[in-house]
Amino acid sequence: MYGLGRNVSTFDRRDYPLSAFIRRTTDVTEKLWAFEVDALNQLDTPHCGGFTMAHYGICHPMPSMYTNQNGHDFYEQCNITDGTPGLQSGTSCRTMAKTGKRLGMWSVYAFATRMAEIDYWLLNEGSLMVGTEWTMGMFAPDANNIIHPTGSIAGGHAWLLNGKIPGFKHGITSWGPDFGINGGFWISDTEFEALFHQQGEAIAAVEVAKVDPSVPENKGCATTKLGKALKRMIG
């Protein structure tokens, strides 16, 4: 049984557009950001948001090692962000992003609105947290480990994008290493774009440190990697 649990974010005019962080062109056409542990497993819980946050931290270029328990804890922190502790009805990508910022995982997050922004980020900067509808056909990658959004909609799901080759994007979901290849799969650019335009979301953030969500929030100052990362982004 695969758990889902992504809710659509409500509009917020304060959101940063990812386009504001793209300042240069690139000739890179292929990139797969390393994910060096077994994919985490949310089991049949609606905790995909918390697990996507954990996967985002695990994935290069600035990896932090998180566990299944971290994924569950991050989900509960999302509930705390929304003022609904203990709720088991999923979470939104914006709440995931706000929670990561509150916990000190990143200081900046921005929403992509176009495929060109998503592709640029995957090829040059790192992975993105995404939220889309998940259809019944997507539960079964084909012989080439490609998923297809066919069949009825099973629900909303948060997952990670961590790679790009011509015509395809690579994703990782939080159903353990037995789904696809270590939780990973490919989806065509065309089919991902169709999902994205059906209330899909994609968020990029700048990681700053490993965070254990079970530890009380540190209200003090911290030295982060944000400055170097922003300098790299804007050239």
Give the positions of each predicted feature.
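Catalytic-core signature of thiol
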Residues: 1-235
